[in-house]
Amino acid sequence: STQKGDTYSWLDAQGRYRVKLDFDRNNTEQGYAYLWLRLAKPYAGDTYGFHSPLIDGTEVAVVFDGGDPDRPYIAYALHDSDHPEHVTSDNHTRNVWRTPANNKLRMEDKRQEEHIKLATEYGKTQLNLGHLVNSQREKRGAGFELRTDEHGAVRAAKGLFLTADEQVKAKEPVLEMTSAAEWITRVNSQSDPIKNTDGKEFSSLD
């Protein structure tokens, strides 16, 4: 980038990066006289692909296609002393994809403490699944949590089913309502007619 420490990646119209090679000793202006190189990706096509932008100062490994010095490309990015690895021996059971702005997908593989966290800093909006922990890795709960400091909305055009009935190992159909229907029938059969202040009876639950 022409701006040292730029917050965002600097790409050309083809999505290539400016790269300064270690053996280039020319005292060129920041961001200029560097090579425009493609970044190799695990998934790529004309209308689809995968991209996690690299920002200024990222160390990369440059290789040459078929050993041709005229066909270099970025093979991968590396952590270094200025950009340390965020998965180390302290949290080696975690799988993490995190952006510079701390948008995050984290998957914990420690047995009996498995969890997934999908989060963004905006409004501290998060989806937490499984063994729920805080930033100190202390247990907060278990199950799932969808939370935000902003507004929330739930919409389901064909219906919304909320139940506290157990469904062991998620083996039954998603909308299995037999147990819930039985409870509603039982409550209706056991309830005496309830009257309002006008002396009229409320109808039983349907």
Locations of regions flagged by a protein language model:
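Structural signature for extended repeat/solenoid scaffolds and their inter-repeat hinge/linker regions
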Residues: 1-206
